Structure formats: structure tokens, C-alpha cells
């Protein structure tokens, strides 16, 4: 796969469950078809939004295979495959590659509070274990550690298959350092939907999006508008959906977006503990916005 393909509008796909908490394969296939119709560039199951901490390894492999088969080669299929024990992260990455993932989204090692050298060594072992492209996933709000720009750029220079970073922060200085220092072909993607417009205006390559679960076409148009230099159209799209992008994080992701998809008739409102359903007050806010946008 060309590294230049890891750009554009990517969706951090939710995992639909039945009421008995088994994976709803039929709903999963419907979601893939929804993204094929909308023109989403990359689909990434088994990440944070996919409730990966609650999935077994067998379930993760099955989900990746299902998404790959349903996509029929028309969309790049990545997969979340990371954890905070390097040996386990390597195994998960190998499993995802074997299941058909064309790229690996590997979260920074959380809870352990490693040094930057420890983070480098963690990703070195993952990169040496697989041949598919690796996306470094920097989400310090969840992991408790930041992957510094210098560490990302060092990894990008040292390993040909570390081809992108998902920068899920609002640290614009760090984002600027990544954009200014990256080697040719290395993609910098935002993980913050509200920042798509300014992030891409700075030279970013796209987004791995939560909101693309609900509005894949709009997120695709927003990304493409900025890429094409049509900032007026991008501002119009951003203005229309700004409140929805915020409401998706009114409670812990992916609870709000899965509730919205339930209201849109895409899946059942089911989560695995410790996630629980959206509060009544938050449901009312989400319902109002979905009605305003004509999504329900």
C-alpha cells in the first residue's frame, strides 16, 4: 500500500452488539456498506470507538475479517491493534495483519508512563513484527502519556512502515512540529473532529473520525473541501455540524455516537461494561440535534 493512501476521511468504526452482547455481524456489514456509499477513504474497526478493550482477540480478528470481506476491496481496511505491554501489542498487530488489516492503528502504551525512549522501543518492536503500515495513535487524554513530536519523527525516519500518526490532541504547537518535520510520504491525521478544518488548513492529511459514523458523507466533503482549498465550503460544513461534533463527546466516546446510530436505525443501543447508556439529559440533547440536522 502506498503511504500516500493513508489520508483523507477515515472512520473510527463502532462495534454493534446484540442485546446478549455478542457482536452484531449483520449491523456491522450494514455500517460498512454505509461507508462505501458515502465514499469514506479508510475504515478502522477495533479502536477506541470500537470498544476494543472489551473485545476478545477472536472477536477482533472476526470483526476485521468481516469488515474486509464486506468492503470488497473498495476501501482501505485498517484495524486498532495495540495495548500497553509491548509483547502483547506485537501479537495483536500480527493477528490483525493475519486477519486482513491493511494498516495497524497502534495506541501509545498507557498507564505504564514510559519515557520517550520506552515509547520508541515499543513501536520499534511493533514495526519490526509486521509489514503493513503502522499509524502511531497519540491520545494522551486517555493514555496518560504524550508521544512527543520528536519521537514520532524519529520513528518515521527509522522505520519505513511507520507511515502515519493519529494526533488526538489540540496541541497545535506539537501538530505544527509534526507537519514541519515529517519525512516525505508520512501522513499526519487528526483524531479531533472539531479541529478538522484548522488542522487541515495547517497542512494535515485528514482525520480518523468519530462523527464519520453518523455523517460519513459530510466528513468526507469537509476533508475534501479543505484539501482542494475551498475554505468557504469547508467553513459552511463545519458550521452546520459543529454542535454534533461536540455532542459526540458529551459523555464517554463511543456512548453518544452509538446512541445516535441507534436513533438513526443502524444498530441496537448496547454497550459492554464498564460503558453504560447515555443519560436521559444527554439523550435529549442528541435527539434535538439529530432532528435539526434531519438525521432522524
UniProtKB/Swiss-Prot annotation:
Binding-site list for pyruvate: 49, 208
InterPro entries, per the entry: Aldolase_TIM, DapA, DapA-like, Schiff_base-form_aldolases_AS
Record's catalysed reaction(s): L-aspartate 4-semialdehyde + pyruvate = (2S,4S)-4-hydroxy-2,3,4,5-tetrahydrodipicolinate + H2O + H(+)
The keyword Amino-acid biosynthesis belongs to this UniProt entry's keyword annotation: yes
Keywords: Amino-acid biosynthesis, Cytoplasm, Diaminopimelate biosynthesis, Lyase, Lysine biosynthesis, Schiff base
Gene3D superfamilies: Aldolase class I
SUPFAM superfamilies in alphabetical order: Aldolase (SSF51569)
Pfam family, one: DHDPS
GO biological process: diaminopimelate biosynthetic process; lysine biosynthetic process via diaminopimelate
Gene Ontology CC terms, in alphabetical order: cytosol
Family statement: Belongs to the DapA family.
Protein name, UniProt field: 4-hydroxy-tetrahydrodipicolinate synthase
Source organism of this protein record: Chlorobium luteolum (strain DSM 273 / BCRC 81028 / 2530) (Pelodictyon luteolum)
Amino acid at each position: 500500500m502506498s503511504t500516500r493512501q493513508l489520508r483523507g476521511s477515515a472512520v473510527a468504526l463502532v462495534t454493534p452488539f446484540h442485546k446478549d452482547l455478542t457482536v452484531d455481524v449483520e449491523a456491522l456489514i450494514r455500517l460498512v456498506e454505509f461507508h462505501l456509499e458515502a465514499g469514506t477513504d479508510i475504515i478502522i474497526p477495533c479502536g477506541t470507538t470500537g470498544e476494543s478493550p472489551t473485545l476478545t482477540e477472536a472477536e477482533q480478528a472476526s470483526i476485521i475479517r468481516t469488515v474486509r470481506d464486506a468492503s470488497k476491496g473498495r476501501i482501505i481496511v485498517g484495524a486498532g491493534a495495540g495495548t500497553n505491554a509491548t509483547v502483547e501489542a506485537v501479537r495483536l498487530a500480527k493477528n490483525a495483519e493475519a486477519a486482513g488489516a491493511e494498516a495497524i492503528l497502534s495506541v501509545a502504551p498507557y498507564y505504564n508512563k514510559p519515557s520517550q525512549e520506552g515509547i520508541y522501543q515499543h513501536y520499534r518492536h511493533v514495526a519490526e513484527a509486521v509489514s503493513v503500515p503502522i499509524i502511531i495513535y497519540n491520545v494522551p487524554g486517555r493514555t496518560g502519556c504524550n508521544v512527543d513530536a520528536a519521537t514520532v519523527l524519529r520513528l518515521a525516519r527509522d522505520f519505513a512502515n511507520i507511515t502515519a500518526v493519529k494526533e488526538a490532541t489540540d496541541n497545535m504547537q506539537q501538530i505544527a512540529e509534526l507537519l514541519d518535520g515529517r519525512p516525505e510520504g508520512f501522513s499526519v491525521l487528526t483524531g479531533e473532529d472539531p479541529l478538522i478544518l484548522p488542522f487541515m488548513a495547517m497542512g494535515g492529511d485528514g482525520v480518523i473520525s468519530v462523527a464519520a459514523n453518523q455523517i460519513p458523507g459530510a466528513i468526507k466533503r469537509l476533508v475534501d473541501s479543505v484539501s482542494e482549498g475551498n475554505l468557504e465550503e469547508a467553513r459552511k460544513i463545519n458550521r452546520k455540524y459543529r454542535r454534533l461534533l461536540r455532542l459526540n463527546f458529551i459523555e464517554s466516546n463511543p456512548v453518544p455516537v452509538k446512541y445516535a446510530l441507534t436513533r438513526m436505525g443502524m444498530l441496537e443501543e448496547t454497550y459492554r461494561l464498564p460503558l453504560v447508556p447515555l443519560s436521559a439529559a444527554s439523550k435529549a440533547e442528541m435527539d434535538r440535534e439529530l432532528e435539526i440536522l434531519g438525521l432522524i
